[in-house]
Amino acid sequence: MKYGLSILLACTALVPAPALAQAAPTADDIAALRAQIQALQSQLNQLQAAQQAQAAEVAKVASAPVPVPPKAEAPGWWGGTTISGKAFLNVSNIEQRSTDLAGNKTDNIQYGTQAELKRFYIGIDHKFNDVFSANVTTDFRYNANGTSKDVLVYVKKAYVQAKLNKAFAVRVGAADLPWVPFAEGVYGYRFVEPTLIDRTKFGTSTDWGVHAFGTFGNGLVNYAVSAINGAGYKTLSRSSNTIDLEGRVSVNPVKSITLAVGGYSGKLGKSNDTVNVHNRATRFNALAAYTDKRIRAGVEYFSAKNWNNITTAAVPLPPLDTPNDKSHGWSGFGSFAFTPKVAVFGRYDWVKPTQTVAVGTDGPVKDHYFNIGVDYKPLPPLDFALVYKRERARNGFINTANGNIGGLDNGTYDEIGLFGQVVF
């Protein structure tokens, strides 16, 4: 009724004053006006009812429980499994010659141009939970140094790992050794050449045994230690009755600086009850490097005792090796990235593999090696490098990753080509 009076007054106000003076509203006019007011009141009531119904529906929807999505089905055993791979390949020309004491020169079988797939790794990692995991990595080697036409396949890694925390993890089986894989990570160009002791056969990358490692102080200090068979990952047999030890401690006082020392002691898997073993091989390693996004520079050093002299007789006869034979060498390496895709790099190695002087020579064997190159990285998993390598050994031979280099007078090894790496 309140609304009706308001409308009536409004309508009355709209009527011109002279009209009111001339004629009073009739009963029919009043009845019509009341009918209009009732119609408006009915429409207003309907509008209010519709608004209330809408509000009730919204409240009903808001108060309804949110449906719980169905729980995803847990993946099978393959859910924690990843597969990775890495390949080292090259197309290059090699010129290798040996010169004897009479001055005669002989070309090596590697002489010429060829393509090689030097390494092809396939790795399978499986994570059981946050503590336990396992890894198997195969190592394929094709046409090694041009001397073998078959495919050599090895189990490079096969281990079970328990990682209790950042400070302590342990692996049982064939796994990375403390020094060579660490040095490869600092060097950065393993696909071009192995690092110092791996190139000259004074160390290897993996072996069978028990391996512990960890880090302290938010990466300030890292350590690794291995108790191993000593014969390397290519040999798995109970042919030795001793355990070899290898260890490393590295420090990063700042993010870009790495300082490390390491060591090895053992009989390299050659000790058993049927072999006379007179010596124990030992090795000391050191490394210092600076690395950032553009610059990589470092130096690596090693010294070894009786590394190639485990089974030599106490009083040597004709063999060159003698008791307490000593070896040492160093490597300097560096690279500079002009852009994230283009970098130049280089390296120089000097090695004295033995202190023994062969008859007719003027001193012990000495090996000089260097490489220089330009690396192009179109994508993070790909590297293509144009490389030149040069090696010269005097007064004898040295067994290296590129073959047996040298001559009784001297020997040279030159290689130029395209070297690549594919990682997935």
Predicted features by range, described:
Residues 6-11, 20-102, 424:
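N-terminal periplasmic/intermembrane-space "pro-region" immediately following the signal or transit peptide
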Residues 29-36, 40, 47, 79-81, ...:
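A general secondary-structure boundary signal
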Residues 95-98, 107-109, 146-148, 158-163, ...:
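Outer-membrane beta-barrel pore domains
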Residues 1-4:
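Positively charged n-region of N-terminal signal peptides that target proteins for export
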Residues 70-101, 109-231, 239-261, 333-338, ...:
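Outer membrane beta-barrel
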Residues 16-18:
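N-terminal signal peptide c-region/cleavage motif recognized by signal peptidases
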Residues 236-237, 408:
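Alpha-helix capping and helix-loop boundary segments enriched in small/acidic/polar residues
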Residues 226-236, 266-273:
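Active-site-proximal beta-alpha loop/turn segments in soluble metabolic enzymes
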